[in-house]
Amino acid sequence: MRRVMLWIMAVMFIAGGKAILAKPAVSRDADVSLYGPSFPVGDLKFTIPSKWKIEPVESPARGGQWRVPPLHGEGDGGEVVVFYFGPGIGGSAKENIEAWIGTMFNAEGHPAAAEVKHHTTGGFKISQVVIFGTYNQVVSLPGVPPVPKSNYGLLGAVIENPQGNIYWRFTGPEALITANLPLFNKVVDSVKPQEKAP
């Protein structure tokens, strides 16, 4: 029972707390440079863009948290979070993508259309989702309802890993998300095992 509760809590944390497909797909081969340091998550590591500013994590469920500056210095910035819970906790790629979709709505109040893709990089199976619409941002306070943010986007990625899946989530204004999609793809595809100590 405890393991089931941990799994449920993990999926809730990843989902948000907790566009549409006419957007052209961005090639994974886009010319995007990464200059930032390597960041460890579980037994893996990723290359982080220097323009992403690391922040103190807001909960123990977050393995890392970054603020992405707004476009042209105006409006809202974006938030990138990576989650890691260990082996067997956090849910499958399908479950988490469904949870992410459940936080985004279209103008009629229905779940927003989502673009889901799967690929393999460096031997790791990766599932990704792109969603645009109204984001129901969950506030981590009892009794406080979600805060709707219109014209927002969500990028999500799940890297399947025997030592525990890695979950990436990037939320922000639609234009910011669209502009950063190639960079997000590069971060996800930068996954590598950490070097083992001799």
Annotate each predicted stretch with a short phrase.
Residues R2-I8, I14-G78, Y84-F124, F132-P198:
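N-terminal targeting sequences that direct proteins away from the cytosol to non-cytosolic compartments
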